[in-house]
Amino acid sequence: MGFWKFPPFLVLSILVLYQAGMFHTAPVRLPLESSFDSATLTEEEVSLLLVAMVKDYVQMKATVLEQESEDFSITAQEKSCNTASCVTHKMTGWLSRSGSVAKNNFMPTNVDSKILG
């Protein structure tokens, strides 16, 4: 998923740098090209393309955030359990954790049956 986040930034930065005037270099002509001129974008077309890309990026981010919020609400619903089996499972976990603490802290070490009576 991380791969899809990089290309929009790359294209957006190239268009911004083009708008700023950083990429005004001479075009490379191959010997096979005859009189065919490559299509160039006018200032208005570049601006429209930039706006469309930003709009698409914002829509993509909104979709991703919406999916993450749906995943979070599903996780929250799974964590809140009201059924008897779920509550029993939670209580078993609490008792097993507190049992190990009680064993370590409160159990006498040298106790015989003769001492207790």
From Swiss-Prot:
Pfam families associated with the record: Calc_CGRP_IAPP
Disulfide linkage: 81-86
Signal peptide from the UniProt entry: 1-25
Main location: secreted
InterPro entries reported in the protein's UniProt record: Calcitonin-like (IPR021117), Calcitonin/adrenomedullin (IPR021116), Calcitonin_gene-rel_peptide (IPR015476)
Molecular functions (GO terms): calcitonin receptor binding; hormone activity
Localization of this protein: Secreted
One Gene Ontology CC term in the entry: extracellular space
Keyword flag Transferase: no
Tissue specificity remark: Mainly expressed in the thyroid gland and CNS. Found in the nerve cells of the cerebrum, hippocampus, hypothalamus, pons/midbrain and thalamus. Also detected in the glia-like cells of pons/midbrain and in meninx of tactus opticus.
Keywords assigned by UniProt, alphabetized: Disulfide bond, Receptor, Secreted, Signal
This protein's record includes keyword Signal: yes
Prosegment residue ranges: 26-79
GO BP field: adenylate cyclase-activating G protein-coupled receptor signaling pathway; regulation of cytosolic calcium ion concentration
Family under the similarity heading: Belongs to the calcitonin family.
PANTHER family in alphabetical order: CALCITONIN GENE-RELATED PEPTIDE 2 (PTHR10505:SF3), CALCITONIN-RELATED (PTHR10505)
Protein name according to UniProt: Calcitonin receptor-stimulating peptide 2
Source organism per UniProt: Sus scrofa (Pig)
Primary gene name: CRSP2
